[in-house]
C-alpha cells in the first residue's frame, strides 16, 4: 500500500457471501455464516447465467488475528476502516439466525 501512497485500508468484514469476523458471543456466525457452498467464477449479470466452481469455501479472522493486523497497519501509519455491512447484505447472518429475517427464509450464504 505504501508504494501506492495509500494509508487507508477499508476492511469489508461481512457480506452476503460470508461473515469474516469472529464474534465470541455469537460463534454460529463463523460456524455457519463464514461458509458458502460454492463460488461464482464468471462475471454475473441478468443476461449471463452464473458459472460456479462447486467447491465449498470459508474462513474468517479470529479476534487475535485482527488485533495483529491492526497493530501491523498502525506501525506503518495505515488506518484500518472496518465495515460490518448491516442491515443490508445480511445473507450470511440470516443463514445463521433466520429468526432475524422478515420473510421467513429459508436463507443460505450467498454465492454471487
Q: For the regions a protein language model found, what residue spans apply to each?
A:
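Substrate-binding cleft of carbohydrate-active enzyme catalytic domains
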Residues: 1-112
